[in-house]
């Protein structure tokens, strides 16, 4: 049967299927933190606070902005004329701008214990100016997650936007975290906290997990029969 997201029990099966501590830790952090794969792979040893039980996530995002070639005013994709200087814009100038954001996330004791064991075994790797927890490329991380899901006997997941089934990927573990959180509590306050935890700029992005989890439809359906419950 086609599924849209993973259950915590299925992710636990992936961890059990891991032969190496590194791979088990990768799956654990992707799910328990609900982070982007780039954030987990960019995790530094100094970002971990074992005493407070938190991890500081650095999110570096490069955004491409379009600008007028004459006055450098910002343009939208559909702009044919510059709103500032009025010239006809045949080819806008592309400018890459980096945005760096930080957020501090709580970590459960089991994940912290796994992290400590991994670091005690010398798992971290030193790079110029920093000590990374993982020495993995995005592609290699994707391969590890895919292979562990297959080894655990998990099905492919259906992507809602396309309706097509795909192998389990790191982002599906992030999705699983969000859906799990929404299924436990989908109140307004909980969704706001989830938005902050996930690093979503817009609450609309967070709200999509209510639809994926089925909670939104369940509430709607239950509301259709409220009168009958009172009559009974």
Where does each model-flagged region fall?
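Catalytic-site neighborhood detector that most strongly recognizes the C-terminal catalytic loop/helix
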Residues: 198-223
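Short, basic (Lys/Arg/His-rich) helix/loop patches that form interaction surfaces
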Residues: 123-129, 143-196
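Short, leucine-enriched amphipathic alpha-helices that occur as contiguous helical runs
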Residues: 11, 22-24, 138, 142, ...
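C-terminal secondary-structure termini that scaffold catalytic or DNA-interacting sites
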Residues: 2-5, 73-90, 224-232
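Short, charged phosphate-coordinating catalytic segments
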Residues: 30-52
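Basic, Lys/Arg- and aromatic-enriched nucleic-acid-binding interface segment
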Residues: 8-33, 37, 185
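Flexible interdomain linker/hinge and immediately adjacent N-terminus
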Residues: 1-12, 58
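C-terminal catalytic core of Y-nucleophile DNA break-rejoin enzymes
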Residues: 63-77, 83-86, 93-117, 127-150
